């Protein structure tokens, strides 16, 4: 498999760009290599705080059984990349805003590796999923400057497929959006300049506020065995309900039992 990575990395951008299933809504035009939108949860701005890192944002729904499986696999993917020498890659999960998903937040948190933050939206804030123009099981990958490199949707976002890992590796190894961290722009400056620069001439700025989008095709997929890798984070699979998020519900005295997880829409 290692010998196939260079070929897969070189082919992935063309493959994704050629398929509206992967990346874009045709009506909105291409938003790849455009700045990420600014969003916050209880005053925190995760994308701004993580400038300089490759960032992977997973939109997962706590009330969806298969989403819980996806969450459980994130730690293994992160560890696999770290074991391969890929550092400064930050993962995060944003739970859905509806009441059922908020009620099951702690189960999503429990399934996710301890040091991967799980953000819970409050019912009155602007919906982060809408800001990102994303949907359940979408993965958005941003480069070190905060530019979108991939917005991968179902069925390609299933973590037992190679597409998410390949997109992260391509973003890590290739300067796909002419990212330069030498420029000194604030989030608001980057947003204003981008709006006045539809041709993308100034896309080397590190900060951003424009949304990105994807088409969404929903399929059912059977849960597959979970493969384990050596973990450089000794406590990464010990789940904690006391960190990483704001605006979250009170932790219940007992966790709900762990279901056998299947994908559904």
Curated annotation (Swiss-Prot):
<protein>
    <recommendedName>
        <fullName>Selenoprotein Pb</fullName>
    </recommendedName>
</protein>
<comment type="function">
    <text>Might be responsible for some of the extracellular antioxidant defense properties of selenium.</text>
</comment>
<feature type="glycosylation site" description="N-linked (GlcNAc...) asparagine">
    <location>
        <position position="28"/>
    </location>
</feature>
<dbReference type="InterPro" id="IPR037941">
    <property type="entry name" value="SeP"/>
</dbReference>
<keyword id="KW-0712">Selenocysteine</keyword>
<feature type="glycosylation site" description="N-linked (GlcNAc...) asparagine">
    <location>
        <position position="178"/>
    </location>
</feature>
<dbReference type="InterPro" id="IPR007671">
    <property type="entry name" value="Selenoprotein-P_N"/>
</dbReference>
<dbReference type="Pfam" id="PF04592">
    <property type="entry name" value="SelP_N"/>
</dbReference>
<feature type="glycosylation site" description="N-linked (GlcNAc...) asparagine">
    <location>
        <position position="207"/>
    </location>
</feature>
<dbReference type="InterPro" id="IPR036249">
    <property type="entry name" value="Thioredoxin-like_sf"/>
</dbReference>
<keyword id="KW-0732">Signal</keyword>
<dbReference type="GO" id="GO:0005576">
    <property type="term" value="C:extracellular region"/>
</dbReference>
<feature type="signal peptide">
    <location>
        <begin position="1"/>
        <end position="18"/>
    </location>
</feature>
<dbReference type="GO" id="GO:0008430">
    <property type="term" value="F:selenium binding"/>
</dbReference>
<feature type="glycosylation site" description="N-linked (GlcNAc...) asparagine">
    <location>
        <position position="88"/>
    </location>
</feature>
<keyword id="KW-0964">Secreted</keyword>
<feature type="region of interest" description="Disordered">
    <location>
        <begin position="188"/>
        <end position="265"/>
    </location>
</feature>
<feature type="compositionally biased region" description="Basic and acidic residues">
    <location>
        <begin position="239"/>
        <end position="265"/>
    </location>
</feature>
<dbReference type="GO" id="GO:0001887">
    <property type="term" value="P:selenium compound metabolic process"/>
</dbReference>
<keyword id="KW-0325">Glycoprotein</keyword>
<feature type="compositionally biased region" description="Polar residues">
    <location>
        <begin position="201"/>
        <end position="211"/>
    </location>
</feature>
<feature type="compositionally biased region" description="Basic residues">
    <location>
        <begin position="215"/>
        <end position="231"/>
    </location>
</feature>
<feature type="glycosylation site" description="N-linked (GlcNAc...) asparagine">
    <location>
        <position position="184"/>
    </location>
</feature>
């Amino acid at each position: 498999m290692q010998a196939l990575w260079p070929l897969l990395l070189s082919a992935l951008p063309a493959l994704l760009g050629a398929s509206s299933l992967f990346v874009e809504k045709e009506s909105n035009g291409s938003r790849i290599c455009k700045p990420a939108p600014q969003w916050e949860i209880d005053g925190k701005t995760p994308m701004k705080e993580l400038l300089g890192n490759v960032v992977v944002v997973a939109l997962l729904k706590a009330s969806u059984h298969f989403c819980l499986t996806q969450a459980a696999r994130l730690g293994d993917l992160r560890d696999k990349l770290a074991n391969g020498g890929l550092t400064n890659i930050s993962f995060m999960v944003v739970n859905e805003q509806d009441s059922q998903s908020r009620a099951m937040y702690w189960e999503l948190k429990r399934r996710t590796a301890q040091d991967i933050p799980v953000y819970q939206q409050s019912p009155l804030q602007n919906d982060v999923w809408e800001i990102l123009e994303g949907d359940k099981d979408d993965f958005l990958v941003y480069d070190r400057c905060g530019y979108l490199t991939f917005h991968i949707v179902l069925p390609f976002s299933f973590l037992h497929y190679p597409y998410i890992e390949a997109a992260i590796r391509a973003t890590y190894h290739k300067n796909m959006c002419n990212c330069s961290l030498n420029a000194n722009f604030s989030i608001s400056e980057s947003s204003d300049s981008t709006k006045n620069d539809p041709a993308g001439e100034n896309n080397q700025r590190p900060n951003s506020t424009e949304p990105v989008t994807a088409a969404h095709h929903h399929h059912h997929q059977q849960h597959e065995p979970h493969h384990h890798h050596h973990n450089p984070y000794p406590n990464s699979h010990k789940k904690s309900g006391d960190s990483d998020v704001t605006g979250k519900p009170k932790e219940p005295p007992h966790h709900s039992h762990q279901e056998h997880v299947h994908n559904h829409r």
